[in-house]
């Protein structure tokens, strides 16, 4: 029996949204393609009327990753039990054998109750004796999390840590019982999700939709060994709540140590405060050479203006600050030393002192050489401290950590995006026989009192020249914000950036990746990164990355442009890069919009086709206003999409009384997708003769009301929409 349930309890925004229809202020307009002329279609697409719905990227174009661990053996024909949870009843008990599995067990048991109608009785058996007393046999009925003693007594052997790491898991049935085993909390999280998937057909689609495709009566025979393709799967939208992100399989623990200002653009936290506002401890007065040479000292100077004494003091300051941060968050193993972001020209991108300029030129028009050399010195100092008795005792006593490690990341971003590697005479990157960048000899650039620069070789303890490569605990965080994310890094449009990746790959270090999925100048508009996302995951996994962060929105809870689809693609692809794009998209529309799924999929396909046909107008930058050009979005087409969302609402209107809880969720999902065409009508076509001034006021009032109900605040990165609303005559 197939069963689908959709949970209001997972909808964080539900409390903010009243169960009322979308505020469409004017009547339905014609959706006939005959009513839209070729000229109205615009954008040089060559299409007359509404573009045909297209199937997105076909799977045969995919660059699949080999060697990933997804050994899934699930047998429903010879199940472990046909009466696992039936008619809200179960003989089973759920057993906690290790405290590290507690959150996963609680999450699974909650969904047994929500999806199958019965939570299982919980038993704690944290010791060998307690597990022995359970008398586990093939005829007992237990769901066991972390019960290592019982697991081994049943004759099972855990896969090696080298194989599944702390994020992988092993799920296996033993008679009527099932074991969920892992080496860490993330492994138990994903193992628990797997158990829900194969017993309940569980899938967390979005903040508004959780689905159960099975009724929980069958416990299939299982043996599953899996490890996610990316061990670190960072959430793309930070406003997705913990419960939903946990169920989507994102890493929910703190991956990067927050130093105060942030976890990424945080260099000022190592210097005593926000330098652009004046360091609150006067550090920038006592040590001006630690800062960039602009008037407001907005960045760090990674060469200390060529002054070796100041450089040594600066390195030691960063070491001590890093140790201080580590002690505050002892369980976090990654810290970024990241230059401040440049927002609206409020900061310089780098220091331009004589020493930094010399390093910039020597390493190939990049600040990365100086930044990597500095980070290496900090990293070695932190590693040396971690070997001391003081450090070992501290982390063992405070966090139970036997051997603490700390990865210190270089933020490969902005003026540091180019790799500091060997280049040909014309500036082109040179690669070795393995297609990797060739390291350069490390240099120091002294600056005397007269401002003269003298180049000096950096030598090791034996007096040998040193190549600039990553120190043992120095890692790379690659953030190509200027790439074209309409395309994958396999495509010609991103050849420059894929060459940079190859260049960086010659410098060692683990590769962390930060990519982008929306246009940050225009949150209201769809950005066609949907079908390139999986390919970019495959590209970076094939280059050796183990962490990927697809930065989406972090300022709006329910944005336009099918933003929830991107989060769903992330959740699936970061776990298994071989998933089918078409299957992921089809499942999303099937469940996210219920009966309106088909028309919303048609709307999506038409938007994608329109964007593809007009890429010459929009370009692919995530920091551009070209996406808003009127030629790309003719009024007739925008009205057609507006009407399609209106029709979608009509299809689910009956649920307002039949299932009010679900209607609230659908209201949120559909209203979010209505924002794009309504925004274009309220802005680009505000002077249209198609409606009166009073209609425009009504339309804008309704838009503002719904935008706020959805829990949104922002129309452009760092700019609240209230600035726009104050200019509207409402």
Question: What feature does the model see in each segment?
Answer:
Residues 23-25:
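Bacterial signal peptide processing site
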Residues 301, 309-316, 320, 324-327, ...:
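Structured mid-domain segments that build the active-site/substrate or prosthetic-cofactor binding neighborhood
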Residues 18-21:
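C-terminal motif of bacterial Sec signal peptides marking the signal peptidase cleavage site
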């Amino acid at each position: 029996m197939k069963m689908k349930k959709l949970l209001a309890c997972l909808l964080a925004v539900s409390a903010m949204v009243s169960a009322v229809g979308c505020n469409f202020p004017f009547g339905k307009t014609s959706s006939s393609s005959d009513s839209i002329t070729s000229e109205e279609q615009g954008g040089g697409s060559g299409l007359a009327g509404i573009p045909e719905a297209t199937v997105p990227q076909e799977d045969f174009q995919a660059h699949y990753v080999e060697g990933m661990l997804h050994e899934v053996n699930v047998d429903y024909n010879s199940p472990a039990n046909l009466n696992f949870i039936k008619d809200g009843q179960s003989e089973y008990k759920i057993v906690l054998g290790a405290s590290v599995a507690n959150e996963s067990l609680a999450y699974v048991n909650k969904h047994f109750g929500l999806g199958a109608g019965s939570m299982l009785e919980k038993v704690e058996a944290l010791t060998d004796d307690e597990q022995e007393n359970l008398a586990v046999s093939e005829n007992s009925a237990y769901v066991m999390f972390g019960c290592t003693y019982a697991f081994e007594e049943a004759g099972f052997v855990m896969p090696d840590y080298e194989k599944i790491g702390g994020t992988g898991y092993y799920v296996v049935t033993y008679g009527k019982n099932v074991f969920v085993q892992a080496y860490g909390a993330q492994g138990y999280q994903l193992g628990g999700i797997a158990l829900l998937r194969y017993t309940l057909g569980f899938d967390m689609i979005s903040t508004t939709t959780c689905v159960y495709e099975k009724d929980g009566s069958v416990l299939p025979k299982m043996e599953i060994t899996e490890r996610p393709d990316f061990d670190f799967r960072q959430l793309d939208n930070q406003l997705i709540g913990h419960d939903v992100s946990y169920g989507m399989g994102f890493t929910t623990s703190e991956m990067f140590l927050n130093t105060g200002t942030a976890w990424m653009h945080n260099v000022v936290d190592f210097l005593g405060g926000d330098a652009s506002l004046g360091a609150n401890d006067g550090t920038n007065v006592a040590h001006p050479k630690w800062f960039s040479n602009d008037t407001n000292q907005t960045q760090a100077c990674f060469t200390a203006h060529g002054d070796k004494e100041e450089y040594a003091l600066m390195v030691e300051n960063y070491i001590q600050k890093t140790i201080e941060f580590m002690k505050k968050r002892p369980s976090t193993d990654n810290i970024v030393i990241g230059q401040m972001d440049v927002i609206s020209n409020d900061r310089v991108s780098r220091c331009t002192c004589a020493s930094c300029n010399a390093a910039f030129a020597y390493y190939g028009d990049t600040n990365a050489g100086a930044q990597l050399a500095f980070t290496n010195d900090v990293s070695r100092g932190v590693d040396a401290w971690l070997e001391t008795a003081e450090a070992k005792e501290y982390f063992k006593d405070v966090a139970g950590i036997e051997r603490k490690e700390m990865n210190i990341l270089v933020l490969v971003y902005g003026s540091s995006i180019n790799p500091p590697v060997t280049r040909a005479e014309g500036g082109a990157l040179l690669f070795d026989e393995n297609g990797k960048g060739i390291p350069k000899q490390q240099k120091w650039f002294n600056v005397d009192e007269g401002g003269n620069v003298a180049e000096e070789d950096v030598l090791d303890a034996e007096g040998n020249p040193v190549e600039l490569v990553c120190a043992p605990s120095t890692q790379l965080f690659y953030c190509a914000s200027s790439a074209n994310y309409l395309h994958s890094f396999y495509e010609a449009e991103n050849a420059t950036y894929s060459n940079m990746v190859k260049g960086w790959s010659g410098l060692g270090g683990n590769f962390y990746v930060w990519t982008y999925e929306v246009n940050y100048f225009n949150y209201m508009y769809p950005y066609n990164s949907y079908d390139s996302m999986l390919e970019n995951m495959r590209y970076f996994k094939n280059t050796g990355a183990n962490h990927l962060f697809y930065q989406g929105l972090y300022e709006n809870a329910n944005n336009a442009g099918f933003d929830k689809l991107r989060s769903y693609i992330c959740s699936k692809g970061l776990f298994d890069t071989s998933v089918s794009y078409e299957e992921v998209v089809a499942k999303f529309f099937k469940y996210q919009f219920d009966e309106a799924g088909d028309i919303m999929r048609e709307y999506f396909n038409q938007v994608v086709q329109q964007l593809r046909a007009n890429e010459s107008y929009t370009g692919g930058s995530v920091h551009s206003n070209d996406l808003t050009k009127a030629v790309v979005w003719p009024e007739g087409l925008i009205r057609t999409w507006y009407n399609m969302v209106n029709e979608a609402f009509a299809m689910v209107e009956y649920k307002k009384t039949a299932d009010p809880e679900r209607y609230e969720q659908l209201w949120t999902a559909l209203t979010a997708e209505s924002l794009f065409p309504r925004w274009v009508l309220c802005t680009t076509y505000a002077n249209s003769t198609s409606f009166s001034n009073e209609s425009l006021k009504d339309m804008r009032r309704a838009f503002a009301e719904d935008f706020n109900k959805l829990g949104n605040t922002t129309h452009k990165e760092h700019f609240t929409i209230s600035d726009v609303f104050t200019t509207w005559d409402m």
